[in-house]
Amino acid sequence: MKTREISRSLTNGVLETQRGGFSRRSVLALAGAVGAVAPFEFFGAARALTASGGGLLPHIAGAPRICRAAANGEELQGPRRQLKLAWNANSVCTAAAPVAKERGVFAKHNLDVEFVNFGGSTEQLLEAIATGKADAGIGMALRWLKPLEQGFDVRITAGVHGGCIRLLGSKAANIDSLESLRGKSIAISDQASPAKNFFLIALAKKGIDPVKEVEWRQYPANLLALAVEKGEAQALTDIDPLPYLWLKDGKLNEIATNLSGEFADRICCVLAIRGSLIRDELPVATALTRSVLEAGDRVARDPADAAAALSGYGGRGSVEEIAAMLRSHTHHNHPVGDALKKQILLYTDELKVVKVIKQSTDSTKFAERIYFDVLS
């Protein structure tokens, strides 16, 4: 059955249900449509019916309460649902997670979330989510897009914020712009880092070949500034908190961040959820996504309180320094839906230009495949 026919069958079945309850014809229409689609396709087709304001499940008498709750925007019912969320406790950009936990946002949405501080490779993290060792994770889009090409059963459900990637240049070497990096070396923490991937893109947009005209030298993250100080590199790029703290030494210029210029509205961090959780327990995935977005708004409104929540999990910097970092980010900016798919598409196109993503990848189809709307 084609998508258009599926949508027509679903629509007819629901309209009959709305007019007069269940009839034999409406039941057959709904059953036939549901049976013709894969799980994710069904969710997408059903969502198309909500455009006029109702949604599918709220109009069906006898639908499980947990499903009606999700469709109506109510809270999950019953005992709190236990979940495992993978994150990096040393990364300031994941502040929404501890805020959600410590300030009762997860509990408000009837979730009991356990943190898994993950230090392995991105592929290992995505595999952990896909196989159920964790239910979801918060991480960097520019680190995750390449591994997601491999087909992990993981879906991005929301952008979290932007602004945590910085490029710093040596004052002694007069590095104060992207153009001044032509023929220079940049210190990075790993060759697949989101910081490197972002500035590959930014340099290419300035007409600089980021592979042939710039050298990327790898060092342990905490030694990047030392490498610049010793002259082994003329610039460094990494993720807060370290770059922000190094700026205070006065030896480095902030050349750019991932909010500079045309990237002002881009996000860097995303929430991704296990595909089987979305298929089997969509209301849970919805509650988790809403919790993280609500916590992100709290971070934006009260960065000092967010810094206090985050500092309890370790990391670098005082509460005041962490709060200042959070103010420089865009924790109010967490796109979903078409806005987020557009950003994924743009990043994919840009990563293809710098040869991180395969040229054969269809950016539009890729964005559709790895994003799932759990909020509509």
What are these regions (language model features)?
Residues L351-S376:
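Conserved C-terminal helix/tail region of periplasmic/extracytoplasmic solute-binding proteins
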Residues G53-D209, R217-Q218, A227, Q234-D240, ...:
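Short, glycine-/small- and polar/acidic-enriched structural segments
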Residues N90, F118, T122, A192-K196, ...:
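Solvent-exposed, acidic/flexible segments
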Residues R279-K358:
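Secondary-structure end/capping motifs
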Residues W87, V160-G169, L252-I278, T289, ...:
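Periplasmic-binding protein-like
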